[in-house]
A protein has these predicted regions:
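Glycine-/charge-enriched secondary-structure boundary and capping motifs
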Residues: 1-108
Length: 108
């Protein structure tokens, strides 16, 4: 395990506090957004980009590992009835985060 991020108190952009300057994070396979967050967006008028900065959007924990061990971690999570999936990857590049969701692509 190279890193773990609990996505509350910093939401989907929290990871940017913990990666080096040459890490470009791509999250392009996010979990479906629970209805609660859609209701918050609708009632508040907040745009989707800010929603991903403020709320975890139903995506609570990230574990950063090498691709070859990801399936085993997902299997262990599922044994405890915890949904898990690969949500993205890291590339070499300038420190940044790209979130690709059903509501658009957001750069941070």
């Amino acid at each position: 395990i190279h890193g773990m991020v609990h996505c509350t108190g910093g939401a989907q952009t929290k990871v940017l506090h913990f990666v080096s300057d040459n890490c470009k994070i791509i999250k392009d396979n996010m979990f479906p957004i629970p209805p609660l967050f859609k209701a918050i967006k609708e009632c508040s008028g907040t745009d989707w980009k800010e929603m991903y900065q403020v709320f975890n959007m139903g995506h609570r924990m990230e574990i950063y590992v090498r691709p070859e061990v990801a399936d085993e971690i997902i299997k262990i999570s599922n044994e405890f009835n915890i949904d898990a999936q690969i949500v993205g990857h890291i590339e070499n590049g300038n420190k940044s985060l790209t979130i690709k969701s059903e509501f658009g692509t957001f750069e941070y």
